C-alpha cells in the first residue's frame, strides 16, 4: 500500500507531499489539515512564470539583452559594405570594404596596393576601374558622385584600358 502511494501519479510539483485516501467507491476524501498546513508552510513565493515550459523573468531579461546585442551587431555589419573586385588576368577575386574609404582616390590607391605588380595600373594607366551597378550596367568609376557610387555598386572590375573603353556605348548614326 505504501509503495502504491509513492508511485501514484499526481498533477502537482514533486516538492508537494500531497496524499489522499481513497474510499471503496473510488472517490477521494479531503486531505487532513496537517497536510494542508505542511504545504502552506513549505510553499515559497516565486515570481510569476510565463509560457510553457515556464520561463522566469531573469531568463526573459537575458534573452531581451541578447536580442538587443544581435540587432546592434547586425546594424554594425550593415555599415560595412563589402564588394567583390576582380582584375582582368588574375584568377582570384578579392573583397573590398567601401565604407573604409571616403572618396575615389582612396579607393584607387587601395586597389593599387591590392593588385600590386611591377607596373602599377594607377601609374601607367594600363588598367581602369569599372563597376557594375544594381541594374547590371558597367560604368567607369568616378562618373557619378561618391555617395551614389557606394549606394549602387555591386561589383568592381579592374579592366585593361582598351577593354574598358570598348564598354562605352557607341553612337550609331549621323550627327
From Swiss-Prot:
Protein name (Swiss-Prot/TrEMBL): Auxin-responsive protein IAA28
Subunit text: Homodimers and heterodimers. Interacts with TPL.
InterPro entries in UniProt: AUX/IAA_dom, AUX_IAA, PB1-like
Pfam families: AUX_IAA
Triggers of expression: Not induced by auxin.
Family statement drawn from the similarity comment of this UniProt entry: Belongs to the Aux/IAA family.
Comment block on domains: The N-terminal half of the protein contains two conserved domains I and II. Domain I includes a slightly degenerated ERF-associated amphiphilic repression (EAR) motif which seems to be involved in the activity of transcriptional repression. Domain II is required for the correct degradation of the protein through the SCF-mediated ubiquitin-proteasome pathway. Interactions between Aux/IAA proteins and auxin response factors (ARFs) occur through their C-terminal dimerization domains III and IV.
PROSITE patterns referenced in this protein's UniProt entry, alphabetically: PB1
UniProt lineage: Eukaryota, Viridiplantae, Streptophyta, Embryophyta, Tracheophyta
Keyword rRNA-binding: no
Alphabetized UniProt keyword annotations: Auxin signaling pathway, Nucleus, Repressor, Transcription, Transcription regulation
Tissue-level expression: In roots and inflorescence stems.
SUPFAM superfamilies the record matches: CAD & PB1 domains (SSF54277)
Gene from which this protein is expressed: IAA28
Residue intervals of the PB1 domain: 80-161
Subcellular location, principal: nucleus
Compartments it resides in: Nucleus
Region (Disordered): 1-39
Species this protein is from: Arabidopsis thaliana
GO biological process: auxin-activated signaling pathway; lateral root morphogenesis; response to auxin
Motif residue range(s): EAR-like (transcriptional repression): 7-11
Biased composition (Polar residues): 17-39
Record's function text: Aux/IAA proteins are short-lived transcriptional factors that function as repressors of early auxin response genes at low auxin concentrations. Repression is thought to result from the interaction with auxin response factors (ARFs), proteins that bind to the auxin-responsive promoter element (AuxRE). Formation of heterodimers with ARF proteins may alter their ability to modulate early auxin response genes expression.
GO MF terms held by the record: DNA-binding transcription factor activity; identical protein binding; transcription cis-regulatory region binding
GO cellular component: nucleus
Amino acid at each position: 500500500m505504501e509503495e502504491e502511494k509513492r508511485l501514484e501519479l499526481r498533477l502537482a510539483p514533486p516538492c508537494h507531499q500531497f496524499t489522499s485516501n481513497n474510499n471503496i467507491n473510488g472517490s477521494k476524501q479531503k486531505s487532513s489539515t496537517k497536510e494542508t498546513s505542511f504545504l502552506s508552510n513549505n510553499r515559497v513565493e516565486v515570481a510569476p512564470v510565463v509560457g510553457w515550459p515556464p520561463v522566469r523573468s531573469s531568463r526573459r531579461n537575458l534573452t531581451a539583452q541578447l536580442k538587443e546585442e544581435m540587432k546592434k551587431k547586425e546594424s554594425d555589419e550593415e555599415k560595412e559594405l563589402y564588394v567583390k573586385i576582380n582584375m582582368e588576368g588574375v584568377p582570384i577575386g578579392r573583397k573590398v570594404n567601401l565604407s573604409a574609404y571616403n572618396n575615389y582616390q582612396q579607393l584607387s590607391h587601395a586597389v593599387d596596393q591590392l593588385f600590386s605588380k611591377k607596373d602599377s595600373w594607377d601609374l601607367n594607366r594600363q588598367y581602369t576601374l569599372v563597376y557594375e551597378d544594381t541594374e547590371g550596367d558597367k560604368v567607369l568609376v568616378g562618373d557619378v558622385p561618391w555617395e551614389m557610387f557606394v549606394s549602387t555598386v555591386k561589383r568592381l572590375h579592374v579592366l585593361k584600358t582598351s577593354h574598358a573603353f570598348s564598354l562605352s556605348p557607341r553612337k550609331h548614326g549621323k550627327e
